[in-house]
Amino acid sequence: MYKRQSQGFNEIVSYAFISKEDHNLFGQKQKTLDVANPLSQNMSVMRTNLVSGLVNTFLYNLNHGQQNQRLFEIGNTFFTKKSNEVFEQKLVAGLISGRKQSDNWKEKYAEVTFYDLKGAVQDLLTDSNKISSLQNCDIDFLHPGMSSYIFCKKENVGFLGSIHPVSYTHLRAHETKAN
């Protein structure tokens, strides 16, 4: 955790319950785990990854004037196996946006890029688990030219990428209707 904070990341904690719409957008086609008695439609399924909470926090902060964001979350996700047995997995996820540094009176700094995100992920991995390769990613909500699966020692340990412009537009439109 301290390594992420030393890179300027702020930790968030989001609900493990998300909307079906968020699951359909970010759930990577995984089976939903419906809540028997949800508090609201926005909390009707258990999350299968942490992306929804990060993106919703990002949009909230963006609407309140925060362009430059570095967020991370460590949280539990929930899955069902073919036998309908439920299991829980702890994951870590992060998000960066805006400029590399805050602008000052003298100069404007460059926007963060895919490579800044890749560097942040690489810094988080231990020396024994450095990224061994990146392979093209086919996750629907990510931009196809700016996304990759992360492999450490031939094991897929995650993904990184930029949100697809169509997904981002959909999120902004949905968020505007909700507020």
Protein language model features and the residues they cover:
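N-terminal low-complexity segments that are often proline-rich with Ser/Thr-Pro
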Residues: 177-179
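Extended beta-strand-rich architecture
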Residues: 3-175
